[in-house]
């Protein structure tokens, strides 16, 4: 990514520079300071396909932010953290300006906390929706009955191109490298078939305090429930998290299987709406709030 324009100390002594893998232990410490659940392994996985900016003061990491470039027209931004001791000093604004450098022709997506929303609005982001974070000890969910011609089955590694195409259609941006990494590392990936053609999929992955279900791509809410119920059953009696779209229609059902709502970050976009084809699959649950 371009060198930050603030690579000389500002009046407060803060220097922005490209983030490297050597920063990850310190970045994890920053997120832990805010009580975010990310493990060191979660940081490593998210950084693998990212570009990052680190903010230092007196040789100490005080802020981070990552961006992911998808194709030629899209990007996501996440894991924007400023240590509480340095908040209120416009470090977040300088960090975001550096992350947005060179993205003027891209549609940029992020999920905002209530604390960060005002900053993102000042930088040109607009609210497009909301994510509902549900989590808890998953209860065995009744399996969702599928109509004739529909079935669930395990995904094979040779199906990567089909899963990448489904994800791109549902998310509105091509994320081939991310889907490839997730398929390799997921504890389970289940595919929803209709007439022997894949029309949806979902993954169960180690993340944070336990496991996370996501992404979940399906043609409709019943298909999404079938995928989620299967994976929640695999992880029954264990901590499970899922981040769903506000309009998914799944919130009440998720609470019935023990996954209660705990947060509701705002979905924001800069540079125009995401183009999701009508009649195609929908993204019912995101990967993480950082990467979308």
State each model region's role.
Residues 107-111, 126-140, 261-273:
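Conserved catalytic-core motifs of GNAT/GCN5-like acyltransferases
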Residues 128, 133-160, 167:
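Surface-exposed beta-loop interaction hotspot
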Residues 1-13, 20-25, 45, 56-57, ...:
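Intrinsically disordered, low-complexity, positively biased terminal segments
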Residues 38-42, 46, 66:
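N-terminal, Lys/Arg-enriched amphipathic/low-complexity engagement segments
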Residues 34-39, 172-175:
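Short Pro/Gly-enriched beta-strand edge/turn motifs at strand-loop
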